[in-house]
């Protein structure tokens, strides 16, 4: 039996899909599952990330929340869930829903159906201005593990100016990421590296496997790189980088 979920964005007026549980981005007073975040810390300048990057970020947030909300033990085989996710999407993304659904099937081992609805993507959750006179040449994901640390060091040793992007949902992980980023700043200088730590938390989280977290990390990195123009590269120094 499939479970229907509806991701609602701030300011959206339409009614949710029938019988669908709602997930929302902290809409005040909403009777639904709140996804807590500080996405307003993400950059809206020098350039506002385009609708494709913002749409992908919203989709990744919805997928990650659904992955956390629905316990695998409730599935018929205690693993493979049937998930129907209704989500806001800019027009270019609507045609990609079948391809993204197949990607998610492979990534999480579930049966996904994405139901995009055409709506304007309010950029209001991306608000921060870039605080430095210099601009980065690259963005790198920075989980705080050894691979991401070595990847950042490799890029800095190559002379690049860098934004390292972290995601956390509890304080201990945030402190590890902040401590490592501070060490990079001390060694290479504050004009070479900037750390962007983004909090995304979902209090309703009975499921712990979370295979979709890599998609959310990728979406956060893409939205960050998009704020600095098409020439800004995104690096993913994870899972084996240190062995290269």
Where are these regions (language model features)?
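Short, small-residue-rich loop/turn micro-motifs
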Residues: 197-202, 238-241
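Active-site adenylate/phosphate-handling loop in enzymes that bind or generate adenylated species
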Residues: 210-244
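RNA-binding accessory domains that recognize and position tRNA/RNA substrates
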Residues: 1-139, 149-199, 206
């Amino acid at each position: 039996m499939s479970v229907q979920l509806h991701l609602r964005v701030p300011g959206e007026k339409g009614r949710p899909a029938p019988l669908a549980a709602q997930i929302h981005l902290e809409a005040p007073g909403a009777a639904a599952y709140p996804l807590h975040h500080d996405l307003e810390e993400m950059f809206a300048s020098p350039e506002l990330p385009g609708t494709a990057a913002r749409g992908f970020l919203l989709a990744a947030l919805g997928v990650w929340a659904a992955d956390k909300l629905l316990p695998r033990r409730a599935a018929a085989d205690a693993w493979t869930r049937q998930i129907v996710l209704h989500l806001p999407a800019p027009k270019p993304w609507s045609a990609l829903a079948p391809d993204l659904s197949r990607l998610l099937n492979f990534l999480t081992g579930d049966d996904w159906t994405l139901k995009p609805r055409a709506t304007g993507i309010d950029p209001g959750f991306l608000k921060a201005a870039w605080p430095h006179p210099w601009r980065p040449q690259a963005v790198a994901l920075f989980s705080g593990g050894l691979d991401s640390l070595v990847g950042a060091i490799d890029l800095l040793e190559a002379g690049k100016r860098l934004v390292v992007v972290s995601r956390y949902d509890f304080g201990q992980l945030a402190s590890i990421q902040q401590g490592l980023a501070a060490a990079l700043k001390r060694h290479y200088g504050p004009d070479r590296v900037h750390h962007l730590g983004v909090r995304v938390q979902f209090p309703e989280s009975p499921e712990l496997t979370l295979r979709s977290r890599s998609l959310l990390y990728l979406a956060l990195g893409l939205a960050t790189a998009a704020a600095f123009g098409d020439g800004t590269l995104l690096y993913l120094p994870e899972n084996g980088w240190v062995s290269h």
